[in-house]
Each structure stands twice: as structure tokens, then as C-alpha cells.
UniProtKB/Swiss-Prot annotation:
Residues 1-30, 225-254 are annotated as: Disordered. Belongs to the KptA/TPT1 family. GO terms for biological process: tRNA splicing, via endonucleolytic cleavage and ligation. It comes from Bos taurus. The keyword Iron does not apply. Keywords: Acetylation, NAD, Transferase, tRNA processing. Its EC number is 2.7.1.160. This is tRNA 2'-phosphotransferase 1. It is an enzyme of class 2 (transferase).
Length: 254
């Protein structure tokens, strides 16, 4: 059933579906997907879109914006249906609003009634919680932890790209996977949620950070897979403490 005429749904289309479409159409779909991501995750207020507490905005209002005027409702429907990461959801709405669309997660805007399933016990958490990043960010993450970085949540996947059942949560070209000790973080009061497309979300601590104490292990994914040490943070702290201690002794001797 078409999402405009039935209950809300968010499904990924067949993986081979796009391969049979002309390259220029695929490029337009990528352009539309990126524009939707910005408007629905970050820019709705700036663009003047009326967003509900659940993150939905009227599709008709969206399509009136200059960057969307070359696209139709059918284009949006196709991008929603064929998006393998299930980033967006459509629902019929009512006669006053018409069809509604939202991003399933990834907001920097506050969306207080986004449909998230609380994961309140260790048993409710996936067996694997992993955050994907790039090698250039790893030293900072190892030292300071994972940060929301302007979004409302830190994104985690229930597995590595290509694992069965893993739809979204990390980019397929990530170079480093950071595995999280969810039960330990949960015991310390850090909440976790599951979005409608299976991404695990956490706001982190009061500072919006998931500290390194919750890292179980780290894995370099490319160019070859190999374990990464978690000792770097402890070594740096030890070196810093030793430097301060030596400096203090030198001042005392003077």
C-alpha cells in the first residue's frame, strides 16, 4: 500500500532496484535524499517548515521550498522506499495537512516525541553496540570519548556493516569501529534507545559524551582489519601526570 494512502511504513526497496534506473535519475535521487536529510534533521525551523513534536512535516510544504520544486511526491516516495538505511518515514496525515514526512533519527533539532524505544535493561540491549568513525578522529575519541557533536544522540549500530539485520547506524566506509559496553553505561545511568530503523541512540552523559571508560575494544576496518589499542588514553594521562610531577619537583628544588 502506498504510504500516502495507508498506515505509516518505512521499508527498504530491493537492493537491485536502483541499478536498472538511468544514472541521471540515480544522481537526482541522491540529491533529493541529501536535501531531505538536511531539511528534516537540521534545517526545518530555518526553512520555515512546521514540524510536529514527533518530527513530521507536511510534504506539500516541503515541496514548495525552492530546493524541492523540481521534485514530485512520487520522487519522495521512491527515495523513501529505496533508501536501504531507512532514513525517512511517510504517513498519510489528515485532510488539513496531507501526507507527512520525517527523518527517523539524526536530528540536531529537538524532537521530543520522536518514536524511540527505550532500552532499559541489559537484556534489551543488542549483543553488539558499535560506533563507526574515521582514523583521523580516533585519537581524539580515545582521549575524550564519543560526542553528540551538535546532534541530540550518539549513533550506534547493532553490528558491523554487512552483518545480518544491520540496516543503519554507521557508514559503510568507516575506518574504525568502537565497541561499547552498553550494560556498564546503562548501570551508570546513561540511557539507550532504538529508532524505527534499528539504530541505537544514546544522549551520553550530562555533557553529551560517552566517555572512553565504556569502550570495550576498537577495530581498524580498513585497509585491513586489526585490533586497535585502548591503552593510548591511559598512557597519555600517565605521561601528563609524570610531566606535572617532575615540574613540581624541579620548582621545589629551586
Amino acid at each position: 500500500m502506498n504510504s500516502f494512502g495507508g498506515r505509516r511504513r518505512e521499508t527498504a526497496g530491493p537492493k537491485g532496484r536502483r541499478a536498472h534506473r538511468p544514472p541521471q535519475d540515480q544522481d537526482r535521487d541522491v540529491q533529493l535524499s541529501k536535501a531531505l536529510s538536511y531539511a528534516l534533521r537540521h534545517g526545518a525551523l530555518k526553512l520555515g517548515l512546521p514540524m510536529g513534536a514527533d518530527g513530521f512535516v507536511p510534504l506539500d510544504a516541503l515541496l514548495q521550498l525552492p530546493q524541492f520544486r523540481s521534485f514530485s511526491a512520487e520522487d519522495v516516495q521512491r527515495v523513501v522506499d529505496t533508501n536501504v538505511k531507512q532514513r525517512f518515514a511517510l504517513q498519510p496525515g489528515d485532510p488539513s495537512t496531507g501526507p507527512l514526512i520525517r527523518a527517523n533519527q539524526g536530528h540536531s533539532l529537538q524532537v521530543p516525541e520522536l518514536e524511540l524505544e527505550p532500552l532499559e535493561t541489559p537484556q534489551a540491549l543488542p549483543l553488539m553496540l558499535v560506533h563507526g568513525t574515521f582514523r583521523q578522529h580516533w585519537p581524539s575519541i580515545l582521549l575524550k570519548g564519543l560526542s553528540c557533536r551538535g546532534r541530540t544522540h550518539i549513533h550506534l549500530a547493532p553490528g558491523l556493516p554487512g552483518d545480518p539485520g544491520v540496516i543503519s547506524g554507521m557508514r559503510p566506509n568507516c575506518e574504525v569501529a568502537v565497541f561499547i559496553n552498553g550494560p556498564l553505561a546503562l548501570a551508570d545511568g546513561i540511557p539507550f534507545f532504538r529508532s524505527t530503523n534499528g539504530v541505537i541512540l544514546t544522549p551520553g552523559n550530562a555533557d553529551g559524551v560517552l566517555p572512553p571508560k565504556y569502550f570495550k575494544e576498537a577495530l581498524q576496518l580498513r585497509p585491513t582489519r586489526k585490533p586497535l589499542s585502548l591503552a593510548g588514553n591511559e598512557e597519555k594521562e600517565h605521561q601528563r601526570d609524570s610531566k606535572h610531577s617532575s615540574r613540581g619537583r624541579g620548582m621545589t628544588q629551586q
